[in-house]
């Protein structure tokens, strides 16, 4: 399976798991670990690939994605997948779960941080803003919300379906410190998460402007690829383009 819905957040997931979060793949349930909630659970393959590369489970297991009997199903399952802190897939609920984790840390006087990745179409759900209101009111400065702002959802452009813009001003209204970045610029990603760590007395929202299908020319910014699998020829072409992107990154 290969869907463009995962690629807009690939750089963000890479930074979180390899640079930002305090985690230990050999001890995935350690009590002081940072927590991550993939609220847009339908990009599970991207999360699974990141977890496998980080050492939570064998990379070979990725080939069992959505097979009968596999623990790697279409949405993350905290009961069966090492490194997954919250089951997700029903859009709009992940921020509430993350807020609960962040509040728990405050009440227990623990130092772990909580990160949650939202889709920009997902924030059309009202529950997102109830959770945001609570997080801001409780000054949860151990919470970082990341919005994958690729501008598209399964039915088309988010502006045509139900525009959530201006996203940054909405989070600011709920007492968030807001940072606007490119989701594909590691220098900006790094600076944003460092800034979030320094912010006290309010949660942080990182609005990450991204490109759906990033790295594959014929898939970029095409909502029609949201849940569509490529044929063999398209797959080969996509892999060829992505390998070139990877080689270019390694040379930097």
Predicted regions and their residues:
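Structured core elements
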Residues: 37, 144, 180, 205-207
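Glycine-rich beta-alpha junction loops
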Residues: 11, 42-43, 47, 150-151, ...
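Short secondary-structure boundary/capping segments
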Residues: 54, 161, 220-224
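Short, small-residue-biased leader/transition segments that mark boundaries at the very start
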Residues: 2-4
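Cofactor-binding active-site loop characterized by glycine-rich and histidine/acidic residues
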Residues: 8-137
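Hydrophobic alpha-helical scaffolding
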Residues: 37-40, 157, 161, 179-182, ...
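Glycine/aspartate-rich loop-and-adjacent alpha/beta segment that forms the canonical ThDP
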Residues: 186-252
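Thiamine diphosphate
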Residues: 83, 87-90, 95-198
